[in-house]
Amino acid sequence: MVEDSQETTHFGFQTVAKEQKADMVAHVFHSVAAKYDVMNDLMSFGIHRLWKRFTIDCSGVRRGQTVLDLAGGTGDLTAKFSRLVGETGRVMLADINDSMLKMGREKLRNIGIVGNVEYVQANAEALPFADNTFDCITISFGLRNVTDKEKALRSMYRVLKPGGRLLVLEFSKPIIEPLSKAYDAYSFHILPKVGELVAKDGDSYRYLAESIRMHPDQETLKGMMQDAGFENVDYYNLTAGIVALHRGYKF
C-alpha cells in the first residue's frame, strides 16, 4: 500500500501528517537501538543472517568499489562489504537515526573495521552525495520506514553510477496462505511481548508488525523501482515471501 495523500502517510496502522512520521520513526529506533541486534536474532530465529548473506551474494560487489549501506543501522552489511571492497574500496554507512549510527560505529570499530568505512547521518529522500557516486546501494529493512518511498528511490537512482545496482531487502507478503496466518499471529501477539521483555518496548515492535503490513508487496515495489528509473528489476522471495530481495540497475 502506498501513501494515502500528499499531506498524510501511515505510521503503522495510524494515519499521520507526513512531517510527523520521521520524528515518530526516530523515536522507535532511539528506543530499540541498544537491543537491536539481540532482537533481530530473537524475532527472526537468526534467519536474518542468511537473508543478509544472500543480499551480499547478489550484490556483485568487488574489490575497489564504492558501496552505500543505507539505513545501515548496526552495520551487519557494512562489515561484510568492507572486507569485499578491500583497502582500495570504500563503504558508506548511512542512517537517519543517530542512535543507530552510533551503535554501528562502535560495533564495527570494536571488531577492527576502521580503514575503509565512513559514517554519515542522512535522509534517504535527500541523499547528500554527488550524482553517480556509488557502484552499489543496499537498504536493508529500512525502506518501509521512509515517509516518501518514491522520492527515496529517485534519490538512490541519482547517486548510483551507470552500471550500478540497488538492492532492497525488506519484509514483504508471504506467498503461502497458511504461513501468512501463522505469521500474523506471531507478529501481532508474540513479537510485541518479546519486545517488551527484552527491549522494554512492546509498542515499537507492534509498530514493526504494522509497518510490515503497510509496506508495498513484491510486485508493487518492483513497479515503484521501475518508475524511479531502475531497469532489469527482479526480486527473490525468501522464506516463502516473508522477506523479499529486490534488485534493479541503472544503465
Swiss-Prot record:
Q: What class of enzyme is it?
A: transferase
Q: Which residues form the signal peptide?
A: none
Q: What is its EC number?
A: 2.1.1.163, 2.1.1.201
Keyword Membrane assigned = no
This chain's protein is named Ubiquinone/menaquinone biosynthesis C-methyltransferase UbiE
For the biological process aspect of GO, one term held by this record is: aerobic respiration
Q: Which NCBIfam families match?
A: MenG_MenH_UbiE, PRK00216.1-1, PRK00216.1-5
Q: Which gene encodes it?
A: ubiE
Question: What GO annotations for molecular function exist for this entry?
Answer: 2-methoxy-6-polyprenyl-1,4-benzoquinol methyltransferase activity; demethylmenaquinone methyltransferase activity
Family the UniProt entry places it in? Belongs to the class I-like SAM-binding methyltransferase superfamily. MenG/UbiE family.
* Pathway recorded for this protein: Quinol/quinone metabolism; menaquinone biosynthesis; menaquinol from 1,4-dihydroxy-2-naphthoate: step 2/2; Cofactor biosynthesis; ubiquinone biosynthesis
Q: State where S-adenosyl-L-methionine binds.
A: T74, D95, N123, A124, S140
The family database entries (InterPro entries) matched by this protein are listed as:
SAM-dependent_MTases_sf, UbiE/COQ5_MeTrFase, UbiE/COQ5_MeTrFase_CS
Role according to the record: Methyltransferase required for the conversion of demethylmenaquinol (DMKH2) to menaquinol (MKH2) and the conversion of 2-polyprenyl-6-methoxy-1,4-benzoquinol (DDMQH2) to 2-polyprenyl-3-methyl-6-methoxy-1,4-benzoquinol (DMQH2).
CDD domains given for it? Answer: AdoMet_MTases
Question: Which ranges of the sequence are coiled-coil?
Answer: none
This enzyme catalyses: a 2-demethylmenaquinol + S-adenosyl-L-methionine = a menaquinol + S-adenosyl-L-homocysteine + H(+); a 2-methoxy-6-(all-trans-polyprenyl)benzene-1,4-diol + S-adenosyl-L-methionine = a 5-methoxy-2-methyl-3-(all-trans-polyprenyl)benzene-1,4-diol + S-adenosyl-L-homocysteine + H(+)
Key words, A-Z: Menaquinone biosynthesis, Methyltransferase, S-adenosyl-L-methionine, Transferase, Ubiquinone biosynthesis
